[in-house]
Each structure stands twice: as C-alpha cells, then as structure tokens.
UniProtKB/Swiss-Prot annotation:
GO terms for molecular function: ATP hydrolysis activity; GTP binding; ribosome binding. This is GTPase Der. GTP 1 binds at residues 9-16, 56-60, 119-122. It comes from the Bacteria. It comes from Burkholderia pseudomallei (strain K96243).
Amino acid sequence: MKPVIALVGRPNVGKSTLFNRLTRSRDALVADLPGLTRDRHYGEGRVGARPYLVVDTGGFEPVAKDGILHEMARQTRQAVEEADVVVFIVDGRNGLAPQDKSIADYLRKTGRPIFLVVNKAEGMKYTAVASDFYELGLGDPRAISAAHGDGVNDMINEALEVAYAGEPQESEEAAAARGIKIAIVGRPNVGKSTLVNTLIGEDRVIAFDMPGTTRDSIYVDFERNGKHYTLIDTAGLRRRGKVFEAIEKFSVVKTLQSISDANVVILLLDARQDISDQDAHIAGFVVEQGRALVVGVNKWDGLDPHVRERTKADLARKLKFLEFAKFHFISAAEKTGIGALMRSVDDAYAAAMKKLPTPKLTRALIEAVEFQQPRRRGPVRPKLRYAHQGGQNPPIIVIHGNALDAVTETYKRYLENRFRETFSLTGTPLRIEFRSSTNPYADKD
C-alpha cells in the first residue's frame, strides 16, 4: 500500500505550501470530509515509481484542552498514528519557539520516524538556520524552501527510503493467484462488515497480516463460484473469531490506501440515508485513481416504493459523474442482490484490463468523427487521425492528430461515450489523451 507522509507543525510554518509542492496541486484530492477540520487535507504525490499519500494537518497545539484547537490536535495525533513518516516543519526565519519544543516532545514518544525540516531557509546559511533546532533532539535538521522548492526533492526522497524500507513486495505470480483485489469502501454503518461476511462466509475465512509497515494490512482471500478474490481491509474492518466487525472510527487514510491498492472498488451506500458529500468525495477519489467501480446501495429491503424512487433520483443527481458504473440495490443482511453485484465486479475488472487493438480503435474513432465532427475554434477545426491504447486499469486511449488543443470537453465526453459503447467499457473510468502528431502509416499501402 502507498505509504503515508504526515506534515506536522505549529501554524504558519509552511505546511500547506509544502503540501502543494509535494502533490503538485493547489488543492487536496479529498478535503472537507464531515468530522474533519477544514485544515486537514489529503493528497497524493509521486517520486519516480514511488507513490505516496501526504496529509496536511492543522496547526498543532499538543496541550490544547478544548475548542477547535483541541479538535485539530486530536486529528493531528490520528494522522501521526497512521503515518509511516512524520515531517515536522519549523520556521527558519522566526527560529525556535516554545510550541516547537512541545510538539517535539510529543513526536519523540510516538516511535514514528521523524524528519525535522527547517522551512523558509532560502538565502540563509545552513549553520545559521539549523543551529537553533538541534536542541529538539530529533537529529540533523534539513533546510528547505517549500515556496521555491529548494531541498524538497532530497528531503522527500530520504523520507520515502524510510517509508518503503521493509515494505513487502508481492510477486506478479502471487498477485495473480490472489485474483481480483476488492476494496469495499463507504461511511461507517453502511454495512461494510455485513457485506464482507456475506461474501466470504464464516467457514471460508483465510486472513493473514502482512507486516512491514506501521499499519498491518489485512487481506482476506476467498473463493466464490470457482473464482478467487482478495478483500482488502478498508477503514476499520477487524476479525473477531470468524466474523469481521466494523470499528466505527472512519479512517480517510485507510480508505484512500485501500482504493489505491484495489483492482475493483465496491462503494457501499446506505439506501436509508441521503447521499452525503463524504460519499461523493470517496467516489471522486476512486475515479481519480482510475479504479474500476461498482456501487452497492445497501439496506434496500423493506423500503417503501416512494422512498426507493426518491433514493434513485438522489443517486442520479448527486453521483452523475459515476454514469459509467453499475448500481446494485442490495441487502447484505438478507443476502439479496449479491450475485449480480459480484458479476458486475468481474465485468468491471474485465473492462479495466481489456486490450484495445489499434486498428479497431482507429476505426471507432473515424466512425465517431464521421457521425459528429469536432467544432471549429475560430478558423481551426481539430483533425483526429488515429488512436492507440496507452494503458490498462484504467484503459487509456491516445488520439493523434492536429490542432487537438481545440477539442472541447463536450466533444471529449462524446468520444468517451462512443468508445465505451463500442468496446463495452462499463464499470471502469476511461482516460483519453490527445497528442499532436502525424500518422506514420498514413501514406503507406
């Protein structure tokens, strides 16, 4: 699973600036979830082939007793507990503050790897910047400028060396033997643990821990109708005897890690509750990660027909961006609708891994353009010449041509729908990339 880097420090030391630098964005992938302060954000970064999650915590007051500072401190502690590496940021311009000492005292007790980072060090000699902070007892300070990027790459590379050390690497053969990896995600109390137990059956549980990170990752292998699957622990499912029960402390980090690690995600919703912003944020992260998706609307049994219609309308309105996914109305407790749900899991995975031959893609592209040409932008009309597959899981279709910057988002969605229909790409996000070039085979017989 992707390691977690937590950014910790008192207010105004540059945590958000470093967050934006590491994630190469000005916003979080998942933000403002209910129960979280607006100052705690989650994003994704990558160095080469090493992806990671980064948590931007609020300003930390370790001894805050009540109010918003207490809540921010509680959430920061949770972020530290879930982190593989903690980056403790201090302010090189203003020097050592009493609050820095309190935070350092707390962090030393956690047992987490700590990287002491002195920010705002641009234009200053290292000895002058670092000297004050040795007394924190956290080793050699690393001087950076989050605003300008100085020293950031070296720092994050060192942090990832620590975070990935001891991470168990699974062979391709072992991964294939596991079958489809499924993450079941959703808010607390939507029925995740009930669905897990319905899927695996009490007498077929094979659970084991994979040590090597600060959080043991629980995988559950099971077989259904002769097919092998692996369930990934999602946000607090823990085994008690032969049954899995939900620990109702919603963990954003675990949810994001599980989604990233999965082949297919089952987003579980509660038919008896309104669709929340949190549901939409989780769904958005699944799409952003390019994961195949099936939506299960649980607790459907016994609902009044009028309530069912209202729920369907609510789903269509609030989750319109999931039109590519299959929705199933199920009861995990009564074990109804589960077979169809799992068939959609198989179909979504098959779609995500489908191979799309270049001749067929190009033919589909030409037919789409003949049916509806892209609009001109001023005097320029885009010319779409040929297409090939650029990747799987999710499928990536690369379109070559001229003046492709003029292709509108509306036309891009039109092409996506045409490709989905032609190649039966239900249940998976689809990426379309445009590259201005010429077809090397255009003038050849």
